[in-house]
From Swiss-Prot:
GO terms for cellular component: cell outer membrane; transporter complex. Component of the lipopolysaccharide transport and assembly complex. Interacts with LptE and LptA. It is found in: Cell outer membrane. The gene is lptD. This is LPS-assembly protein LptD.
Length: 803
């Protein structure tokens, strides 16, 4: 018989004052107290098919029995509650529900007021508490790179953000949550938030699938700190122990906690077998550190460390690596990086970024990542910034460590920049000013390569002052705009060590002179204008808005002889759709082209009427010259012809999940393509992506790039990339791998080949086993795959509906 709830407190009152009129046992359908007499926090509610009240202050519920308190609820076949001793005994089909999950078993004894007791042979389910744990053995907020702990380009990542080396995440997708279940021979409840399980097992696999689990002699769970501690624990995969530890401590929900991270291992052709053991130290809520020992079979033992700190007003990192007496070279080798960013408020900020390595071959020999092996100049710089609504100020001190021994960037010791922007009635007034002191590294050589294939021998240094005020009048309407602009560019040079010698590609001297201290003043006039037209069109059953957007940009700058002005920071801008609309074709301040030129460009777009999404954009542009080029860089021949190359861009987002991007630069005088970039991606759903790319730059680059991820059936995915240089007839990077998703665990193995700056290529082998987000064992290739295969999605993130 289903009855309404009764309340222990009122039942106690009835038993205490009405026992003279009661029988030894009393069957009752309901005891209905007055609600105002029931303090909710202390209320214990019992219900069942049959409830019995005993004179010795015991309550018994039989059939569909349950007992509820403010923190937990117990179900069972029979529930007995001793009012006087506050003891609970539940027999048969016991189910205990708490804020952390559910525990079931055959029998439970507990003191609800203190949440102490025990249960035999429990089985437990946790409310996804363990999902997304970063690494086995800890939940330190820690990212592990493929090579080490500290090659992190993002030195400003907040300490509260999950920093795991898992770049397989995709927008709009989240990691599949495991059921987080387990069992034990017994559990002891040691308070409201503490449980101790004996001979426990834990897994995130579905019921009936025990592909992997953690088996621990003792497992402690603390719901208050959200941490767990296991002793004498081992990980078993497919019934085979693969990892053992005497003690592990971890967090339920990715809170940072001190402890050992999962060891990683792999092999490379340059360093041999690698094994990394990192330890995470949670020093304070705004401060942490990671210390690692990396064993390299061909080199020795490398020590690594990273220290991070985060405050409301500042943040920073310190990264160190040290390999004493490299077995391959006999040298002590190191890498160091220190970065800090400080916000002083009121618009003021400051930062420094310092990097240094022991030798030029450090990255090419110690790293497997192509973005690292190709590094040439390491910054050693600091700056102070100020910004408000109208003004910005920057003070920069900058040096570099150059690793290739060829091109040494000039040092800025210091560089001061002040810019202003304000409205004056309908006019827009701007000011750019800069003073810089250029110096050279003591190791710098005088010979520098030129764009023309020759060399420029010089050790010129000096100081430079720039002032460029300008005024413009923006005028805009819905159908178009026009903006005339007038400016005056002033530059002053104080030159030291001005002697230079220019040689052609055969080594013959073509020019020999000396840079002079001088000043240069140039007026600059430009008009930027554009129109906007649109119409509605229908293609098949789809409605679009088609636009036509012509743009015209005119620039006039008179000629000034600049051949004896040193080149501190100027180079030629790449010709693209953006640079077609620049006043000066040179970057930096040392060269300002003479100009009497007009740029014409046309853009047409197809925009969906239903979604507003741009489906197609086509842009074509060209610059027309009305004066010969008289200003150019040393070793570079002046432009011939009265038009620039034609620039074209196409961006298409097709309805069948194809994305296509095309860039082309065509020289009309020689009827040849100077540059082509073509990329196409087919990405119909997560886990399916194919990429085809081609890059060509005349006399410099000719590469094809193929990559993809594709399901092979029954949870298997194929992975690959092939980047090949047609110019050198050799591969640049090759990747081949397999990935398997079993639902509660994933495995992936990847082989990588990377061409380095030296003649020999570097090979790396990755193997990783992910156990339901709890354990990540092996060397993590996810960042590599995310970079190498655009559109890649980790199998742990792919919804079941796509598999």
């Amino acid at each position: 018989m289903k009855i309404r709830p009764i309340t222990f407190l009122v039942a106690l009152v009835c038993l205490g004052f009405g026992h003279a009129h009661a029988k030894d046992t009393q069957d009752t359908n309901v005891i209905d107290p007055s609600p105002e007499n029931l303090p909710d926090p202390d209320a214990i509610i019992i219900e069942g098919d049959k409830v019995q009240v005993y004179l010795d202050r015991r309550l018994k519920s039989i059939g569909n029995a349950s007992l509820s308190t403010g923190q937990q609820k117990v179900h069972g076949d029979t529930i007995e509650y001793d009012v006087q001793n506050e003891e609970l005994h539940v027999i048969g089909n016991v189910r205990l529900e708490t804020k952390g999950g559910r525990i079931t078993g055959p029998e439970l004894r507990m003191k609800p007021s203190e949440s102490i007791g025990e249960m035999k042979k429990p089985a437990f389910e946790l409310d996804s508490q363990f999902a997304n744990m970063p690494q086995f053995g800890t939940s330190g907020n820690r990212r592990q790179d493929n090579d080490n702990l500290v090659y992190s380009s993002n030195s400003t990542t907040p300490l509260t953000q999950q920093n795991i080396e898992d770049s397989g995440y995709a927008p709009g997708l989240s990691r599949k949550q495991g059921v987080s279940r387990g069992d034990a021979s017994g559990v002891v409840f040691e308070g409201p938030d503490r449980k101790r399980l004996k001979d426990a097992r834990y897994t995130t696999c579905e019921v009936g699938s025990d592909d992997w689990y953690i088996r621990a002699k003792e497992l402690e769970l603390d719901d208050y700190t959200r941490t767990g501690t296991a002793r004498n624990a081992r990980v078993e995969f497919q019934g085979v122990p693969i990892l053992w530890t005497p003690w592990i401590n971890f967090s339920f929900l990715n809170q940072r906690k001190s402890g050992f991270l999962a060891p990683t291992w792999g092999t490379t052709s340059r360093s041999g077998f690698e094994f990394l053991v990192p330890f995470y130290w949670n020093i304070a809520p705004d401060m942490d550190a990671t210390i690692g020992t990396r064993f390299l079979s061909k080199r020795g033992v490398q020590f690594q460390g990273e220290f991070r700190y985060l405050n409301e007003n500042y943040q920073g990192t310190a990264n160190l690596e040290y390999l004493p007496s490299d077995s391959s070279t006999g040298e002590n080798r190191y890498y160091a990086k220190f970065a800090h960013l400080h916000n002083f408020h009121n618009g003021w900020t400051a930062a420094y970024n310092l990097e240094k390595v022991s030798d030029d071959r450090y990255f090419s020999e110690m790293s497997t990542r192509i973005v690292t092996t190709s590094r040439v100049n390491l910054p050693q710089q600091a700056y102070v910034n100020y910004a408000d609504e109208n003004w910005t100020f920057n003070a920069l001190v900058q040096k570099f460590q150059t690793l290739d021994g060829l091109n040494y960037p000039l040092q800025r010791l210091p560089q001061l920049t002040l810019t202003g922007d304000n409205e004056w009635g309908p006019f827009d007034v701007k000011l750019f000013t800069q003073w810089a002191n250029f110096d050279r590294n003591n190791d710098a050589i005088s010979t520098q390569a030129t764009l023309g294939g020759g060399t420029l021998d010089t050790l010129v240094t000096g100081k430079r002052l720039v002032a460029y005020p300008s005024i413009s009048l923006p005028m805009a309407r819905p159908y178009g705009y026009i903006t005339p602009k007038l400016g005056l560019h002033y530059t002053q040079y104080q030159v030291d060590n001005g002697a230079f010698t220019l040689r052609d590609s055969n080594g013959n001297i073509t020019s020999q002179d000396e840079y002079q201290s001088q000043s240069r003043t140039l007026p600059i006039f430009s008009i930027d204008s554009g129109l906007y037209f649109d119409r509605d069109v229908r293609i098949v059953k789809n409605r679009y808005t088609q636009t036509l957007e012509p743009r015209m940009y005119y620039v006039y700058i008179p000629y000034r002889d600049q051949s004896l002005i040193p080149v501190y920071d100027s180079s030629i801008s790449d010709l693209n759709m953006g640079s077609l609309f620049l006043e000066n074709q040179f970057t930096g301040q040392d060269r300002i082209n003479n100009a009497n030129q007009l740029t014409l460009a046309f853009t047409s777009r197809m925009i969906s009427k239903n979604t507003g999404e741009q489906r197609l954009a086509v842009t074509v542009g060209q610059r027309y010259y009305f004066a010969d080029e008289k200003v150019y860089l040393p070793g570079v021949n002046p432009r011939s012809g009265d038009t620039s190359d034609i620039i074209g861009e196409i961006t298409a987002r097709l309805l069948n999940n194809w994305n296509i991007d095309i860039f082309g630069q065509y020289n009309t005088d020689r009827s040849v393509y100077v540059r082509n970039n073509i990329s196409a991606r087919y990405n119909p759903e997560p886990g399916k992506t194919l990429n085809i790319g081609y890059r060509y730059t005349e006399d410099r680059l000719d590469q094809i790039n193929l990559s993809g991820q594709w399901p092979l059936g029954k949870g298997w995915y194929g992975l690959g990339r092939w980047n090949y240089s047609l110019r050198e007839n050799q591969p640049i990077e090759g990747i081949a791998g397999l990935e398997y998703d079993a639902g509660c665990w994933q495995a992936r193995t990847v082989m990588q080949r990377v061409s380095t700056a030296t003649a020999d290529a570097n090979y790396a082998l990755y193997f990783q086993l992910e156990l339901g987000g709890l354990a990540s064992i092996g060397q993590n290739p996810l960042k590599l795959l995310n970079r190498a295969i655009p559109g890649y999605t980790s199998s742990s993130l792919i919804p079941d509906s796509y598999q």
